[in-house]
Amino acid sequence: DIITNELKEVKEQFATPRRTEIVEWSGDMEDEDLIEREDMVVTVTSGGYIKRTPLIDFRAQRRGGKGLAGMQTKDEDVVTTLFVANTHTQLLFFTTDGMAYKLKTWRLPLGGRTAKGKAIVNILPIPVGVSIAAIMPVDVEEKEWDNLQIVFATSAGDIRRNALSDFTNVRSNGKIAMDLNEGTELVNARIAGEEEDVMLFTDSGRAIRFSTTAVRVFKGRKSTGVRGIKLLGQDKVVSMSVIRHFIATPDERSAYLKMRRAVSGLVDEEINSDEDDVNENATISPERYAEMSASENLILTITSGGAGKLSSSHDYPVRGRGGMGVAAMDKTMRGGAIVASFPVELEDQIMLATSNGQSIRVPIEGISFRSRSAGGVKVFDTKENEEVVSVAWIADQGGDAEEGQQD
């Protein structure tokens, strides 16, 4: 009786009409239908761990927090990849051995800002000794993938272009993206339109820029493609980027870069000496300068010795593919082999990791602007027998994601 009376009191005090309705469901429901659409920060480490964390967690930690570098890793394990993707976004994974895998963001392990994450080998069937070369979020519906192209680059200097729809159907055990020769690795994979250019950088300090249309769209996936840049000796490609296409005459480029150097406070002697027909007396109209400035990409270059610089995309002439390219950094001043080179915005940050397990976060705006063939400035003060081994790009999230603290 006591229990009955207590339950009656609870009913009288808290009873409210049902707000939901129970109906018969005739359709099919997938797990994904129950997943809320939410922006996630996806983090990958050099030790092969991956996780997703709600972006709002980083916003809550903005004041006094450690921001995007807050995850727990071993001393030798550092963040190498970091980007924001929606829970329903398709992620294409490409490995250094030329395989492709596909997962939705929500299928990645969910972890807090300081969580370690889960080993990628427990999520994707990646062989020992193989690592992730690229992770590509694709927000476009799969039915539209046939209208997009994907560009691949290998360490041997080859490049290939395929329809993105070639990777619509990817089994759980993966799909061959590129049949690589022994000793060759996949360097990167990026979506590229016909109004964009491809840039390849080698570890010896060479760079080449050409239109994506210089590479035909391949029908198969096993070919290694065509030559993107001619390599000498033990040289190898270490970075591939896709930037805005822009054609300017040699005089326009010369005049623009002269004004750009003046704005950045560079000395007149710091010009590129590896180009023909450089006219230091060339002029450019204010309208053309504004047009070139609006289309400019800032190219970040980092070396194994910890040196780095920003340079103008207009400093890299558009040429045909297959050549030796131009100097991307002075041989006597670059401070080691080039580790990475890619376009950035001044609001972004980068995270550098060394062979000794040390890491540091650096705001892009603190890196000096230099001419293409000039040497870099010290970005990371490496010790003896220590080298920078990876550079992670941290895109700006409108000032909400983190505070910009260096670790």
Task: Enumerate the predicted regions with their spans.
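C-terminal interaction appendages of subunits in large macromolecular complexes
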Residues: D1-D407
